[in-house]
């Protein structure tokens, strides 16, 4: 048989063959070593089930005045986007979808239904189906028994399609033409329609095919028109869209939510137009949970699919399907025939007699109430103890059960032990569908196993019995510890494959969850859900004390601590009369601002002892965190964690450098074997690089002029959060505390106001400068004492500030890096560039710099470029600090304030020059009143002049002992002290004398490292190096 004929003749087999081919392709890709998990394993086809779903939703959307035209138009655009998928499909594929839809719509009714049942994926496949059908009708004797669709592949169409299926069943073409055989759908479709959420029974939908006996209202005369039958079924099904469980799995969470919203909106619109009617089961399921609570695979009856079942067989198969399902609250329905007498449970009688009464009614009506009790188990009088033990959870021993219904209360089941099992409000509302009774029986059966000791489930590996299936599954997991899933990248093992899939996202950098509003991607669904709250503005966590709402639970907990701190401080006045534990004393001291622990070296105080131990690492140079890969040590855990991420990125780069997907990526433009770049975020305007994206965003505010932080007290804007916090502290200092220690109303600052006073009690004894904290005074005194507490452990060099030590230690780290890589990987780079302090060379003049930013600023001298431009007046500057100082003119901001006179200045250098006046005035006050400080200096200079009484050597020694006259030996004091021994020429400075002696000695100490030429002056060497750089 040709392939096209075979696909047309056996559409179900063709569809399942295509699915198996896709699964084999995906499995083959996973087994391949070059398979990249980042790429989606799901194939993109032209007619995916999700696309068909949203196509039907797009075509069947109804306009309603309550929604409004704008909302309806936006809903149509969203449905069309999910149907045509312009972000995935090409223009040709989108056109193919539109052409296929129009082609199917212009086909005759019988042909359209037949082609839709075969689910073609393109127009050519639909034409092939019609051509094969035409050949069969022209003269072949082959008869298609009908497409035996599997529930996982069959597409549940719209209400119009189901009406056409019903029409095709009653059509005379079934018996008079070969096309009728092709149009004959199997009975499983109608049974599945009923099980997928239809409120009518299959027998009610097919009255002519499956007549029932015993109920006069169920008989349908042959003369009854098909139009009347269709009018009875024209309800919510006309705008309803249903689908199989496999198709539901193809949809993501956004598509499922959109489907649920559209179905509920169509139901509300129909209810407002038609009037009140019975709520369909699909709507009930959508309001409760997902519409697919059933496994439709069990709905497929075995046997010959060609033979149409009778009404009894179909009812028996339906009952058997329902009884074999797990007890889900939203999955079962209770169907009662409209023509049968109402079945009810008598009040105050036993449940056993109630079921027997229902069994007797079965002889009169073949559609009894369906409950979760097997048909053969309804006759409880024939049950034995042995049978009950074998049946397990599916049997009910109703010996001690009474069905109670008290007027004004809910129904309940009562056990012999006195425990009641009541019907909840949700089940009570839907008790006419059988949910309430099923829920009571299910809960009662679980309780009954406790008394009877039934172990209805399987035995575990160790022989232990479990009464509940969930307990059995949990017990089996203890014996499957040996079965583990190992990560191929890092070797970590997991007990479940789903945990391994989540873990591998860390290596693949996959971000599968995307925000529907702004498009931002996330690695975890919880982070995406938390991010979407920003757009919706939902703040679910509300404080019951001040009614303030928060978006995150962590922020809510921090806010609750502020109330607890206020309460603790109120109780603090009674602290002497109460006995607290040491832990509470420590906690209360932390909240009240007490610093009980001091550092023995710098006298800095802290709240708790652990902070002191961490602080002392600065003095001891202890670095307890050591990297096992590069042997690098760190003082803080945060720096160690940030460093380990670099190794992870380097490992990820090495693993993927040979993959095709990463070869074409611009991120892999580095040479093979190169280490991971620490600074990966580049500023496009100034070229500065950063290690974090947040730091880059903060840096770009310099160019854009954005100031997102605004003070609520004075309205001033700030570009950085740190500057904003410092500014807010000034307002907190101005506020006066009321009634003892209290807290500011601002939640940003949770420190007592009493610690923010204008007093600066710590004063320097040498220069008179005052400070607020004692630690600041100790740091300041290093300027006078010359203390350098920060010492390099490798070379012994000492520094006054820790920042200078960190900058110096980079030299040693670069030296180690150069020793490891040698010069083979960087053959064109000189060793002194890697190991020296100045690593960045200017291509114009040959000058070197320690930082790349300084080099870029220096290049502006040659090019005349001024990169920093003011957005308000358009003035440009070559340095960033000059632009910042200039912008304060527009904002009238003067952040630098003199502590003596209160005068404010724009720049720090202006404040420094102003403070020198106060310093000179303070020194003049301490000096004798007869003469000023300048006169005193002149007098001391005159005393230190070299003369016959005081030789030159004694003059130099006296000058070196004076802290105020350090550079006196280089200042002209009337005589040139430095004399040349050869020619007798004298100079003011010794450096001038050394340079002069080179004329006599012909010394050329400056040598070019490239050509070997020597020079007497360094300026000549720098000028000579420019020639090599240009060449």
UniProtKB/Swiss-Prot annotation:
It comes from the Eukaryota. There is a cross-link at residue 28 (Glycyl lysine isopeptide (Lys-Gly) (interchain with G-Cter in SUMO1)). A zinc finger (C2H2-type) spans 485-507, 513-535, 541-563, 597-619, 625-647, 681-703, 709-731, 762-784, 790-812, 840-862, 868-890, 896-918, 978-1000, 1006-1028. One of its GO terms (molecular function) is zinc ion binding. Residues 17-29 have a biased composition (Basic and acidic residues). Keywords: DNA-binding, Isopeptide bond, Metal-binding, Nucleus, Repeat, Transcription, Transcription regulation, Ubl conjugation, Zinc, Zinc-finger. Residues 1-43, 911-939 are annotated as: Disordered. Transcription regulator required to maintain maternal and paternal gene imprinting, a process by which gene expression is restricted in a parent of origin-specific manner by epigenetic modification of genomic DNA and chromatin, including DNA methylation. Acts by controlling DNA methylation during the earliest multicellular stages of development at multiple imprinting control regions (ICRs). Acts together with ZFP57, but seems to be the major factor in human early embryonic imprinting maintenance. In contrast, in mice, ZFP57 plays the predominant role in imprinting maintenance. Belongs to the krueppel C2H2-type zinc-finger protein family. This is Zinc finger protein 445. The gene is ZNF445.
